[in-house]
Amino acid sequence: MQYLISSLIFLIPSLGMVAGLSVAATVTIFLLMLFLRGINRHCERLKGAWQSHKAGLLRLLRQNLQFFLAMTIKTELLFTAWCFISCLFAIRPINSLATFIQVFILLFLGFTVSNCVPFGNRVQLKNSLILGILTAILLFFIEYSSHGFLTRTFKASFGLYMLDRGCALLSITSWVAIIILLSSGKRRHALMLYILVLYLLSISDSLASFLGFSIGGVIFILARLIKPIFFKLIAISLITGSLLFPVIAKQIEPRDLSEKYLATQPSAAHRLFIWHFVANKITLKPILGYGFASSKYIKVNNSEMINYNGEKWHPLPLHPHNNILQITLELGIIGLILFLCLVYKYLKQINNIKSSNFRAASYSCFINYYIIGMISYNIWQIWWISSGIWVLVLMKLLVKPDIVVDN
């Protein structure tokens, strides 16, 4: 079991670089292995055959469920309940309910695993993670310099954008490696890793990952320098900015802004049109929204299609490419308030960490993930949720046990 866990810790970031969607499968397998490990350890404490094992399994599940309810009744459970309720009035209730089940089973599994017994032989697992990250970096440069040598083995063509998911995964996973190096006294190596990943992201096609990782670096420094006021500063900034974003998106003139500042960035220009369109849709159902995971089912008339520089763009291709707008569009103001309550809660938990480096790296990773979600990806995409859970589990079971922290 230990060998398989070590192999997966190496494989997830490295394979994820060239096949980003694989994270959904590899992280799920990783979580299931840890979950089964927890069950086996619990059952080993019990004597007897099948009945004892059965009783142990049921007892473990009951304990995890009770702990889950006790810890989340004020925030997570309320948000989950509202997501479920919104499925009932969604544009396609069955599809929304199916997505809801997938998402929250994965989240529950991740929560359960993250509260299990820490990894054994953590030095080996830490080395596997760092080696996996370095392999991911190497694979990126191979693909970048050879115009997709590995990708073209399986696909007819290659575009640098095909590595965007891998870059996003690398950007958030690197913070785990950075805190591992810092906690081992290897500050120079941690700085070198940050600079290397930052350079990689700067030449990649993933602007969201580059912005998230670079701002994460600034956050790391600020969290170390102004610890007494940093929590209030970051909490007020994030929550206020998130509340104002739908208002700002409605007020902007995407065509004027695109022609002035984004003439050579069609992808960024398209996002401005998407955000403006979504903000206008939000005003039609501001309180309840359109229902969980309903973005891709909202009908668009031909008159609403965007004509820009001879190209015809869809104003809402699958999702809003912004987590705050997607939450508000699908779950309404009620969902947005509950979501921001979760954001505040997690920031508060990070602030309770006593280790300066661990606290700063946790802030950086959280902001990195948040910023990527504000520019790219569907908030309910399984591979993206899996990426966040993957980092959470590593932080709690691989990094935290070797650092004295609170919460």
From Swiss-Prot:
Pfam families: Wzy_C (PF04932). It is found in: Membrane. It is a multi-pass membrane protein. This is Putative polysaccharide ligase RF_0568. The keyword Cell membrane does not apply. Keywords: Membrane, Transmembrane, Transmembrane helix. Belongs to the O-antigen ligase family. The chain crosses the membrane at residues 15-35, 71-91, 100-120, 129-149, 166-186, 203-223, 229-249, 272-292, 324-344, 379-399. One of its GO terms (cellular component) is membrane. InterPro entries: O-antigen_ligase-rel_domated, WaaL-like. The keyword Transmembrane helix applies.
